[in-house]
């Protein structure tokens, strides 16, 4: 999150959540981490970074022919692109997109070229950082030049668990995905879902109730371990997860 972010930035004056602010627009944006993550993982590779990124630069520069599905997606998102950007992005054009059109992304090509030539500094400092923060200021976002310059990628151990003899590997905190997956899979592990029938009311209800419990835990306990204490061992323990399902009644919604 940006350094100036606060715990109530997505709340109204009465303390009620303003969901749109956390999901769309400049205020919803966290400091971009993909570039730092790519450079952190690159040390395990063999090819030079410039060679790896060059095909993407050329594709963005020359463009590619879009499919009918891609045209529908771009057209369907046009209003959102126009609403949440102060400068029209490459994904928006005057007339509707159609299959066979070429999507050219000159700004992306320029951004990737700066990364190719200057490494991480080509993104987190200099021209790209300036462009990002200027857009943030125009749109009411919080990402600053200092946020970008100070960004680092953190290496964390993945979540690993067993499910019916299979080893499952998931994302660690601050992503909740890995722990949520572990909770949900463990809560249904001793149940014969196949016998319920695909997409039957019984199987759908079971999955809904399992997800409700996991996401309730997500809202209550999960977050960035650098800032909050997440009771990982408890949330993933067989005893705890069995207790979470004690009030599950087939055919009835849990209050």
Across the structure, where does each feature detected by a protein language model lie?
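Internal maturation/activation junctions in enzymes
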Residues: 190-255
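Noncatalytic scaffold domains of N-terminal-nucleophile
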Residues: 1-125, 129-172, 176, 236, ...
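Hydrophobic (often cysteine-bearing) scaffold residues that line and stabilize catalytic clefts
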Residues: 34, 177, 203, 207
